[in-house]
Amino acid sequence: MIDRKLLLQDFDKVALSLKKRNNAMGDELERLREVITRYKKQLIELEGLQAFQNKVSKEFGIKMAQKVDTSDLKKELENNKIKLNELSKSASELEQQIDLKLSIIPNLVDEKTPLGANEEYNMEIKKILTPRVFTFKPKEHFELAQQNGWIDFESGVKLAKSRFSVIRGFGAKIYRALIYLMLDFNEKNGFEIIYTPALVNEKMLFGTGQLPKFKEDVFKIENENLYLIPTAEVTLTNLYNDTIISVENLPIKMTAHTPCFRSEAGSAGKDTRGMIRQHQFDKVELVAITHPKESDVMQECMLESASEILKALELPHRFVQLCSGDLGFSASNTIDIEVWLPGQNCYREISSVSNARDFQARRAKIRFKENQKNQLAHTLNGSSLAVGRTMVALMENHQQADGSIHIPKALEKYL
């Protein structure tokens, strides 16, 4: 959540950030401006009424001590108190309206984030590893998966519905090996391995920004205040919900392997075949909580940690700086890692590493104490990596002419 003080004192800065995101909020933003104007006016009136109440109360006390008639002053105090209570209630209601709007306003766009309306304006930063030149036409992963008996898409549909899969046989061993490899690399880079619940309450999803704006994107448990997690970012970040951390304990670096669940609302017709876009998928996540001065360096650290895994698996990839119009709700700055998929002849996202600055920390009340003063921490999150998409990339990049899959040396010890 952005700072309410900023919204009240520099509304135009917030409006400009929304414009950069290609998200002007239209009439809603103007209505918010009107509410803020009324709220500020009422605060000034409240100050005046309170000052008057204090002044008359003092006079009332003096006259009472002097045993002088105070009936007029008493009436003034009573009338003023009624006005105070009414205005205080009205201001409180306006404050609630502002806070509700605040909860659906996305993070401020970082100065380093380039301007752009959509993903077409994203900027490639660098490429790592050169894509292999095939002497045959490479197949897509769903063909290879079925040929090798690694993934059973039909059974996924039978057990649930479309966008679910069953991984079995040697494919399941590869899948498990990828998870172990990812966790080992992340731990080597200083991230504590944590296993968390796959269900969270509404407060936790508010803390990381999924609620209230993106309610349709998450699965809710019927008759319970519980939701299936869309990412371990939710659980790892909220381990420190409403917590004050000693500055000596920063940064906090965490990694978790979890199943993730997403409704994929608005994705109809996209990636309908294979494992690219699923309702349930596994992901190894990185989350860091840092001092504000250290979050930029941490973002680079997290990117390199994810890139190390792809290099070990001999998978060509690139870093892409997202433009302002392609940023996620809670992100101030995001760099994607895209992996090369020869079957599709393009790069596809396999990790997004985002710096949320103090946006999530303000929502979740994640603070640190330095010099006897509580301050908001910075939070970062990123995949390291999406397991299914890594398996997709492995199949497509390491396929042989006969459809078999070469297994990278880095995975051998896990098989």
What are these regions (language model features)?
Residues 127-415:
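TRNA-recognition modules of translation machinery and tRNA-sensing kinases, especially anticodon-binding
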